[in-house]
């Protein structure tokens, strides 16, 4: 699936480079747009192998309005990491849009910056 992108590639590359199994890795999900704020279209659902024609909530996607869903980005990252065999996954609870006192957010303020996440050996 196209939506797996960097997480899938990162786990595979780290395991190839170190000879470890995915179960020997740990992941920390940094701050990001939260599931109550991240509105996406059908293209994003398709990229993660979901059916945009469905009218019910699908794992990590909740219908919001016609053609729009709320996406759980940390949930999607956890899903991809778990599917690859990574079992120790932490973080992902801080929403950059909702917490203006601690985080910048392009969607909220049109200000760019960087956040961090990590996948490493245990």
Task: Give the positions of each predicted feature.
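Active-site microenvironment for binding and transforming phosphate-containing groups
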Residues: 1-122
């Amino acid at each position: 699936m196209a939506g797996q992108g960097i997480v899938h590639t990162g786990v595979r590359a780290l395991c190839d480079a170190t000879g470890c199994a995915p179960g020997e890795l740990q992941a920390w999900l940094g701050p990001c747009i939260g599931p109550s704020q991240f509105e996406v279209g059908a293209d994003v659902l398709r990229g993660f192998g979901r059916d945009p024609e469905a009218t019910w909530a699908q794992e990590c996607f909740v219908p919001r309005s016609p053609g729009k869903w709320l996406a759980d980005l940390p949930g999607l990252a956890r899903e991809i990491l778990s599917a690859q065999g990574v079992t120790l996954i932490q973080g992902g609870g801080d929403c950059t849009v909702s917490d203006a006192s601690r985080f910048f957010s392009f969607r909220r303020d049109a200000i760019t910056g960087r956040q961090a996440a990590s996948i490493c050996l245990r």
